[in-house]
């Protein structure tokens, strides 16, 4: 009789399996945004604003790179200004000597 009950014995896990999830990943921060402040003096070629798309438009003495980064074309003082009613632009004005 004892031999028969051992053959029918079933063992169950006392802890559930670990499982898996489809979450748990995140992308690296892209470090976008202003790199120079209003009123700050910058040299030519300095990055003023990193962006995706045109949140801020280039103004006087400011160029726009292939990835929409705004950069200074000349040495001068940075000014963030309004462009029309709903847009913004950044300009660089040369320092008078």
Swiss-Prot record:
UniProt xrefs under InterPro entries: Ribosomal_bL27, Ribosomal_bL27_CS
Pfam family, one: Ribosomal_L27
Keyword field contains Ribosomal protein: yes
GO terms, biological process: translation
Cross-referenced PROSITE patterns: RIBOSOMAL_L27 (PS00831)
Maturation and modification: The N-terminus is cleaved by ribosomal processing cysteine protease Prp.
Keywords in alphabetical order: Ribonucleoprotein, Ribosomal protein
Record propeptide residues: 1-12
GO CC list: cytosolic large ribosomal subunit
Region Disordered, annotated ranges: 13-37
Protein's name according to its UniProt entry: Large ribosomal subunit protein bL27
Domain of life: Bacteria
Organism of derivation: Streptococcus pneumoniae serotype 2 (strain D39 / NCTC 7466)
GO molecular-function terms, A-Z: structural constituent of ribosome
Family: Belongs to the bacterial ribosomal protein bL27 family.
Coiled-coil ranges per UniProt: none
């Amino acid at each position: 009789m004892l031999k028969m009950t051992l053959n029918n014995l079933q063992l169950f896990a006392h802890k559930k399996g670990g499982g898996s999830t489809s979450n748990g990943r995140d992308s690296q921060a892209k470090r976008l945004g202003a790199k120079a402040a209003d009123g700050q003096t910058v040299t030519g070629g300095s990055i003023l604003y990193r962006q995706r798309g045109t949140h801020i438009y280039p103004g006087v003495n400011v160029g726009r790179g292939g990835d929409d980064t705004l950069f200074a074309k000349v040495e001068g003082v940075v000014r963030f200004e309004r462009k029309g009613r709903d847009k913004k632009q950044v300009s660089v004005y040369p320092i008078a000597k």
